[in-house]
């Protein structure tokens, strides 16, 4: 049993202007409105219930509806709204998951860069240490060569001058 009413029909029942009702209908969620065969906007039963709550008036008196049916329909509306909220939050969570994945990837890249820099620094330190050892060895060889030259010179002069 599908109850739908046009804006004009609702305005007539409530005794309000069509424009006032049209403005209210535009504020309703999409699921509370539809288009009929002629392309005219109609308000569904759930939308009519919401309008009844807004205006505190009964819109469709000719069809008696039990309190159980009203309660069930109200519950369906609430469940639909909660489901929409759950979907919105789920989409938000998916977006956060994507952001976290991107951050994780950025962290992995940074970790690789840090490891590479550590390796380069270690290599540089090893090269510096080797260069210092080579320099020390060359200095020792130079000092040794100087001593040999000095001893050779002394030996030559000592022999020359009878020493």
Swiss-Prot record:
Molecular-function annotations in GO: DNA binding
GO BP, one annotated term: positive regulation of chromosome segregation
Predominant location category: cytoplasm
Keywords of this entry: Cell cycle, Cell division, Cell membrane, Chromosome partition, Cytoplasm, DNA-binding, Membrane
Membrane topology reported for the UniProt record: Peripheral membrane protein
GO terms for cellular component: cell division site; cytoplasm; nucleoid; plasma membrane
Superkingdom of origin organism: Bacteria
Effect of loss of the gene: Nucleoid defects. 15.7% of the cells are anucleate. Unaffected localization of the divisome. Chromosome-partitioning defects. Newly replicated chromosomes are not segregated (in 7% of the cells) or partially segregated and eventually truncated by the newly forming septum (in 21.8% of the cells). Segregation defects result in small cells, which constitute the majority of the anucleate cells (86.3%). No defects in chromosome replication. Chromosome-pinching takes place as nucleoid is asymmetrically distributed in elongated and constricting cells.
Compartments reported by the entry: Cytoplasm, Nucleoid; Cell membrane
Domain remark text: The N-terminal DNA-binding helix-turn-helix (HTH) domain and the C-terminal membrane-binding amphipathic helix (AH) are both required for the function in chromosome segregation and for its proper subcellular location.
Functional description taken from the UniProt entry: Required for cell division and chromosome segregation. Binds to DNA and is involved in segregating the origin of replication (oriC) region to new daughter cells.
Subunit text: Interacts with ParB. Interacts with FtsZ in vitro.
Protein name (Swiss-Prot/TrEMBL): Regulator of chromosome segregation
Source organism: Streptococcus pneumoniae (strain ATCC BAA-255 / R6)
Gene for this chain: rocS
């Amino acid at each position: 049993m599908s109850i739908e009413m046009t804006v004009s029909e609702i305005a007539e029942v409530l005794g309000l202007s069509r424009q006032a009702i049209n403005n209210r209908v535009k504020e309703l969620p999409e699921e509370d409105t539809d288009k009929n065969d002629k392309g005219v906007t109609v308000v569904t039963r759930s939308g009519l219930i919401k309008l009844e709550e807004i205006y505190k008036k009964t819109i469709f008196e000719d069809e008696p509806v039990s309190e159980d049916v009203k309660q069930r329909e109200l519950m369906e509306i609430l469940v639909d709204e909660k489901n929409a909220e759950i979907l919105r939050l789920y989409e938000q969570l998916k977006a956060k998951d994507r952001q976290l994945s991107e951050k994780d990837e950025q962290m992995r890249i940074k970790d690789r860069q840090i490891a590479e820099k550590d390796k380069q620094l270690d290599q540089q330190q090893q090269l510096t240490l080797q260069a210092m050892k080579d320099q020390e060895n060359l200095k020792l060889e130079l000092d040794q060569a100087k001593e040999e030259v000095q001893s050779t010179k002394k030996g030559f002069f000592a022999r020359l001058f009878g020493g």
